């Protein structure tokens, strides 16, 4: 199994990037938090990797810090939490915030995450309640997305800045997208749509 990759940062999207190691490009899925922490292409980076082998695919999930990787592993032990949902949770909540949410049984914070309904949030809280206290909090900076559109806008701009876009060029695009979606889109949707427009 692959434990980490060290190489050149290549193409970046809202939920993945390419890491070029010795001329081989590895497609690495990651949270917006990890993508924001990576240097701009084509700088060198090192990402921790969790390898997931499925019947039809061999997938790599990358993390800027060990705490996020460990939480990814723990989250995916919960029935109904696949890799995509785990990354969505880790995009919205830092490891420290997630530990706090579980300790406080804060279901509302979990249900704000795309793909997490009330029933799944309850299952996460129940199954991880006794394990969360032993998990690393990590040094990550909180960029959780609150339900108000102002918070989504600020977090989207932070993520886009981490992907190399200047605030001056990203802010009008994010504003238009939020207006078009009536301010109700979640963070992942706003980042994805913004990248689509900025790439034109």
UniProtKB/Swiss-Prot annotation:
A GO term for molecular function: ATP binding
Residue ranges, annotated region (Domain III): 148-200
Signal peptide: none
Region (Flexible linker): 144-147
Claim: rRNA-binding is one of the keywords in the record: no
Chain segments carrying region Domain I: 1-64
Keywords: Cytoplasm, DNA damage, DNA recombination, DNA repair, DNA-binding
Region (Domain II): 65-143
SMART domains: HhH1
GO biological process: DNA recombination; DNA repair
Function: The RuvA-RuvB-RuvC complex processes Holliday junction (HJ) DNA during genetic recombination and DNA repair, while the RuvA-RuvB complex plays an important role in the rescue of blocked DNA replication forks via replication fork reversal (RFR). RuvA specifically binds to HJ cruciform DNA, conferring on it an open structure. The RuvB hexamer acts as an ATP-dependent pump, pulling dsDNA into and through the RuvAB complex. HJ branch migration allows RuvC to scan DNA until it finds its consensus sequence, where it cleaves and resolves the cruciform DNA.
UniProt note: domains: Has three domains with a flexible linker between the domains II and III and assumes an 'L' shape. Domain III is highly mobile and contacts RuvB.
Matches recorded under NCBIfam families: ruvA
Name of the protein in its database record: Holliday junction branch migration complex subunit RuvA
């Amino acid at each position: 199994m692959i434990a980490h990759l060290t190489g050149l940062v290549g193409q970046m999207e809202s939920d993945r990037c390419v890491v070029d190691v010795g001329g081989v490009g590895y497609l690495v899925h990651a949270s917006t938090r990890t993508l924001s922490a990576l240097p701009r292409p084509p700088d060198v980076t090192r990402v921790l990797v969790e390898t997931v082998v499925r019947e039809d695919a061999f997938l790599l999930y990358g993390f800027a810090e060990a705490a996020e990787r460990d939480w990814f592993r723990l989250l995916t032990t919960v029935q109904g939490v696949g890799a995509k949902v785990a990354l969505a949770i880790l995009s919205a909540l830092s490891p420290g915030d997630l530990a706090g949410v579980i300790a406080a049984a804060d279901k509302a914070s979990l249900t704000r995450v795309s793909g997490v309904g009330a029933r799944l949030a309850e299952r996460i809280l129940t199954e991880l309640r006794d394990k969360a206290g032993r998990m690393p909090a990590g040094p990550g900076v909180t960029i959780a997305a609150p339900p108000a559109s102002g918070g989504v806008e600020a977090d989207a701009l932070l993520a886009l800045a981490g992907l190399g876009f200047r605030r001056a060029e990203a802010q009008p695009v994010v504003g238009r997208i939020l207006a078009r979606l009536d301010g109700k889109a979640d963070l992942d949707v706003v980042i994805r749509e913004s990248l689509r427009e900025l790439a034109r």
